[in-house]
C-alpha cells in the first residue's frame, strides 16, 4: 500500500532503477558536508513526498516522479508551505474547467457554494465540541454561539459576508480549546509565526490538511486555482483552502486534542524563540504519525454503505463538488454524524 514519506533532514535524492535513494547530509563545524547512511525507498511504496529540509535533486528524478504520478510538497524552515511539484494533469477536462469557471463567475452560485463550505465546517466544529461536552467539558455556551452564527449564513448575500461570519464562528470555536486541553493554553489564534504550542500545531496541521486536499483535487477534474469561498489568487491553490475548511475540525483538531491530552507531545517537542514557537524534528515526527493514523482511520459511510478512510473522504468531497459544478447532483458538504 502506498503511503506518504516525510523528509525532515537535508539531503540528496536520486533515482536508482525503480528505487528512490535518499542520502541525509549534515554540515560539521568546518562547514564540510558529511553524507550519512543512505535510505532506499521502493517507488511502488510512495504516494507523495513532504520535504522539510533542503533537498538536492536533478531533473531526471523529477521526470521519474512525474511519470509515476508522485507529487512533492515543499516547506521552509518555519514550516510554511512554499509549493508543490505536481505530475502532469492527465485528468484535466475542458468541459469541467469551463463549468468551474462559470460557477465562479456566477455570483449566486459562488455564494451558494461558499455558504455550504462554512455550513459544513461549522457543523463539524459543533460535533467536535459536543463530543467533549458529553465528557464533562462545559462547552454548551460556545456550541450555542456557533449555532446562532451558523443560522445567519442563509441570509448572507455576498462571499465577504460569509467570510465575516466564518471568522466569528472560528473565533468562538477557538475559545473552546483552552477548556478541552488539559495542560496547554491556546490564547488567541496567532500565525506566521505561531506564538505557542497549540497555535504551532494548528498551523502545522492545517498545512498538512491543505496539501492532502491538493492531492485529492489533483486526482479529479477540478482546477485547484478556481475557488468559491477564498479569493482565487496567484501562487496558491485556493480551492484546497475551501474544501479543507470542512475537514480541519474532524481531522486536524481532533489529532491536536488527542496528542496533547494523551501526552504524546510535551513542551520538549517544541522550539521557542522570542515570539515564535515551532515543532522540533522529534515533535514533527510524532504529530505526522498521528495525522497519518487519522487519515487511515475508517468509518461506515451512510451513503456508500461501506467503510471509507478520512483520506478517501476528502477525495469523495472533491467528486461531490465536481458533480454539482457539472450540473449532475447538488453539492452537500460532509457533516459528521457520530
Language-model segments: residues:
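Short, conserved beta-strand segments within well-ordered enzyme catalytic domains
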Residues: 14, 21, 48-51, 71-74
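A surface-exposed, charged beta-strand/loop segment in the N-terminal or early-internal portion
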Residues: 53-124
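Active-site helix-to-loop segments that bind/position phosphate- or nucleotide-bearing substrates
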Residues: 1-30, 40, 92-338
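Extracellular/luminal Protease-associated
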Residues: 41-56
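Glycine-rich, highly charged phosphate/nucleotide-binding loops
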Residues: 31-32, 56
